[in-house]
């Protein structure tokens, strides 16, 4: 889907609004979204004005089910590398993976200062230590309302509520005007900590004049308001009461410091010890305690190795694995491969998270495994064990009403969510000609006079597989998909380099296709087909080895399909002597 302007005819009355404060009207600002549009994750946006650039966020997205063997997907950094001399800094809205997960890969190409709140910098620093980059990177800790000067940009962080502490929006001022990028946000009037979203500052910018708003679209299809985190505390407290004589195991996001603190507080109320399982959970909670974002009373925290020394009713285990990750602690518990934890009928398990789209099957598999072991399992939809960290429609309307932008760009969502958010904006009187549903790689040019699209820039998905970054492309994925569906047949033969005659073999090896011992007639027939194809090449004086391999592959493929209605990958290996 290309970038879309004028989403539909608008019959809504235009609201009276204060005029934009005069700026240098001839000066445009360019916005280049490199990720986060048409997808949930991989958020990355570049702003350019007067020869200066800043980057907001640098996240990853986890692979689709058909991306076999791929660990994660990151943005294509070609454009920022080409413009590295213009970049004044990397600003981060908050510490979730879809906003910070690609930073190590970017820093392997560029040396950039990172601007983030205290907790956000702590989470990034932990991540960079795994790559040996933490000591080489300049961190600048920021606080809400503290303005930053980066080239021609003046940036003010604005406190917002989210499912992680220290989340901010950014008001980005330039000679072209002021742009507000919300990051992930919701409006929670009774948050657990840090206070409500700073509506006053957002309103101040709306009064001064906002050129454009880039706003979180994740929950654009959900009416009403997002529930408060206090609701989760009440729901989990009632479940603690139900599990009086059982060990409690709770899976949640390791980055959800609020949720983990809630669990600790409830455990203390119930007289239970707390243990953590999962590397990211252990690392994040240790870092949160060190920075003062988490408080665990003395004597409450125990090692995972100590949990079996206490009666089950005196233990709460907080673990990773709420998204069904195959190697997570909860997954290992479900498969009986966790070193310290054996799940059984005495366990009460709460999955305090909603599956990210695409993870539903993985989560269901873990739930089934835990139930088969005799545990009682509670998950999202059964009780109030999770609330979203993203704004629903009424909060999105409030953000639009407070900031009163001239132009609106919905971001952070799949196309259907961006579209719905655009319709919501139009319902508030923003002219549809001033609303743009863009795509990754768009070159959005804004000024006081107009919004237009320039020449697109390089943007896309770079796949990370182990230590390989970008070496897995569509051809490799197609081969992996082929292998996963019908398997592989390898043909090995030794041939005379001068005559082409077969000196040894051909031998056939099957992997993921058929079990050879139970299909000897099929494999004998396949061997005969290969011998015939090689003999014909000799008779017809075919000496080009690529042509010989193609003939062998086509002959064998046709035979196998006739016999099995399957099409395995066929790999001929001819050794010349």
Predicted regions and their residues:
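Short, small-residue-biased leader/transition segments that mark boundaries at the very start
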Residues: 2-7
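His/Asp/Glu-rich metal-coordinating catalytic cores
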Residues: 15-91, 96-310, 328-342, 361-365
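A glycine- and charged-residue-rich anion-binding loop/surface
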Residues: 37, 61-71, 86-87, 379-382, ...
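Conserved hydrophobic residues forming the short capping helix/wall of the S-adenosyl-L-methionine
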Residues: 128, 425, 560
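Broad gene-expression machinery/nucleic-acid interaction feature
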Residues: 152, 167-169, 314, 486-490, ...
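Hard-cation-handling environments
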Residues: 222-352, 356-525, 529-541, 549, ...
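C-terminal tails and terminal domains of large nucleic-acid-associated
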Residues: 541-577
